[in-house]
């Protein structure tokens, strides 16, 4: 008898869906997850903004109420009141999902790679897409560093040292993971995938510049090219999940929060109605993200100052809400904060006028 559900790909979205199914004692049939290397998830880090009533569901391991952006001497520092910045390790996500799968008699993780459509009542495809389908690429290299003494970094550096490049925007992401651990991650939003070796060298230079007199060691590295929108559709062998299914934010790459909620809703719908409602991003989010991607392609030199002004003019909670949900009200708040001339010219497609 064919499985009730077959999930192809066991990354964040595939395992999140499986874990959501595991919350039900009895399922209509078997649930299979095909993933040749589930341990890959353990090398990743997921960050997101959340409200206190979301803590139990999103399960942050590290939290911070302060975040900042900078370009040269210009700095915008936020302190959230309603929203907090949270981080969860891929290791914790993986271990939690594997425990849930192991404890459920009807769910099984199979170490296999599937490239053709399997037989099942419901099939989900969460495989990564080919990089040549990306509209814009977010390239990053991260190093997690363990210090012998407290590193003294109190705020999350969302986008520090922002500079325009020939192909987009480069910045460093600095994430405190407790008092003695720090994730340093040089990132590019780029029309041409960045060279990992260059980003890695910039990470090392950042550590020398800022912590040259401290003792530390690198305990983990991570790197990836992730999509910021798609210029062409990939061929799916099931209902698309994760980045493939539009669950990651085109303009930022944030996806953990959306994926967790979307996969939980999919599991509930299947259990109650045995149907899947297609995932759709809010229209306001699609519009805002496309505007930002067009600026990356046409006027990357204008982006650092635009982002600094937005961060300076928006309240911290409005900024966080826009980054996570982007409702029509969130978009209106963004437009009020953004510099009028660059956004108006971008809306008209007159990028040379910016």
Question: Predicted segment positions?
Answer:
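C-terminal helical "tail/cap" subdomain of flavin- and related membrane-associated enzymes
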Residues: 267-354
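Conserved Rossmann-like nucleotide-cofactor binding loop
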Residues: 13, 39, 129
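N-terminal FAD cofactor-binding segment of flavoenzymes
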Residues: 20-24, 29-73, 141
